[in-house]
């Protein structure tokens, strides 16, 4: 069960890494603006926004997604090097850190009509299954 939990959490890390990297690429290389703009506003509303508003949102998008990429890499290393070996501290670190991120992902998107709900649900489900399998294995003694 520990191996399965580690795999599911690694999938969480990989999806988070890929989505955040894609968004960073789009915004940093000026391929487009923050995807949040199109999720929340109509094209006519975006056209009427001041350029500084769009730049500010893009800046926050770059900041958020750069942290998300870094967190995903750190999570992957903790899973691979520590959790998969049954180290309890790794379980608690991942439980608190990823749990914090998942809770605030819902809180952050709530005022915007839960614009990212599809992604939030998938990532939260992977987190709950992965951390649940890992925790059960570590604390019930089934470290396979």
Where in this protein do the model-derived segments appear?
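Topology signature of small-to-medium multi-pass alpha-helical membrane proteins
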Residues: 1-144
């Amino acid at each position: 069960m520990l191996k399965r939990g580690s795999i599911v959490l690694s999938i969480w890390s990989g999806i988070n890494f890929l989505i955040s990297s894609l968004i960073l690429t789009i915004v940093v290389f000026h391929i487009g603006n923050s995807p949040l703009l199109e999720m929340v506003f109509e094209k006519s509303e975006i056209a009427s926004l001041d350029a500084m508003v769009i730049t500010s949102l893009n800046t926050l998008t770059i900041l958020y997604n750069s942290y998300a990429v870094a967190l995903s890499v750190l999570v992957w290393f903790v899973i691979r090097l520590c959790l998969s070996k049954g180290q309890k501290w790794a379980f608690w670190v991942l439980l608190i850190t990823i749990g914090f991120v998942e809770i605030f992902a819902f809180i952050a998107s709530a005022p915007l009509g839960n614009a990212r709900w599809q992604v939030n649900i998938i990532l939260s489900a992977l987190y709950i299954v992965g951390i649940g399998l890992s925790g059960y294995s570590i604390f019930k003694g089934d470290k396979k």
